[in-house]
Amino acid sequence: MTKEFLPTILKQKQEELASLIMEEVKPLRLTYRLFDFLKEHHDQLQIVAEVKKASPSMGDINLDVDIVKQAQMYEAAGAAMISVLTDQVFFKGNIDFLAEISGSVSIPTLAKDFIIDEKQIVRSRNAGATVILLIVAALPEKRLKELYDFAAGLGLEVLVETHNLSELEIAHRIGAQIIGVNNRNLVTFEVDINTSLELSTHFRDDKVYISESGIFTGQDSKLVAPYFNAILVGTALMQADNVADKVKELAIDKG
């Protein structure tokens, strides 16, 4: 993988679209609304726990994991949502993983992929996702808004991912309610938790915010907890000897 990660993966996504059909929309899986849950449980830093076998930056993380068991451990440990990598080429994920996990837990599931088309959104919803990811850096603002509105029209919630102030302003502009701040630069792969801290000064009270990437310890959690409703954690949980203990370490009391 080159340092030009985002253009490379978006090119791959365009190629995948050629063979992707527009599925008929199936009933939405019933669970709670993530936005409402995060607003109601603001006294504790909530955990979005990720199931991922590999990543371009880390390589293989946990290829032999029982994905359903892992997800059920996350739910039992108190995770607010489970993020499921569905990209095959770069993250060794699969849309079937999302379906299997969504059918085995009762909490919201996030379709974690590089979504650039309505067909991907419908496919994710049909696989049980109740939340999808849209990345500001991956889409022109007009297209981002179109996909956001399309997903919302299907009853889905949308996690809109940002990395800098201009992207955060776009997220606010399109009406995003759930906004992620990725501490990882998708071009250079570099991770800096200060990204979350710097952008937090521009947050709005009517939104919820999730800090993503580079959070491994309770100390990391303490840095972002005053400003964020939740953190998205993948590698630290996939490599943990005891998932419940790790979630407890990260889900710190904000009171």
UniProtKB/Swiss-Prot annotation:
GO terms for biological process: L-tryptophan biosynthetic process. Pfam families: IGPS. The keyword Amino-acid biosynthesis applies. One of its GO terms (molecular function) is phosphoribosylanthranilate isomerase activity. Pathway: Amino-acid biosynthesis; L-tryptophan biosynthesis; L-tryptophan from chorismate: step 4/5. Its EC number is 4.1.1.48. It catalyses: 1-(2-carboxyphenylamino)-1-deoxy-D-ribulose 5-phosphate + H(+) = (1S,2R)-1-C-(indol-3-yl)glycerol 3-phosphate + CO2 + H2O. Keywords: Amino-acid biosynthesis, Aromatic amino acid biosynthesis, Decarboxylase, Lyase, Tryptophan biosynthesis. It comes from the Bacteria. The keyword Amino-acid biosynthesis applies. It is an enzyme of class 4 (lyase). Signal peptide: none annotated. InterPro entries: Aldolase_TIM, Indole-3-glycerol_P_synth, Indole-3-glycerol_P_synth_dom, Indole-3-GlycerolPSynthase_CS, RibuloseP-bd_barrel. Belongs to the TrpC family. This is Indole-3-glycerol phosphate synthase. It comes from Streptococcus mutans serotype c (strain ATCC 700610 / UA159).
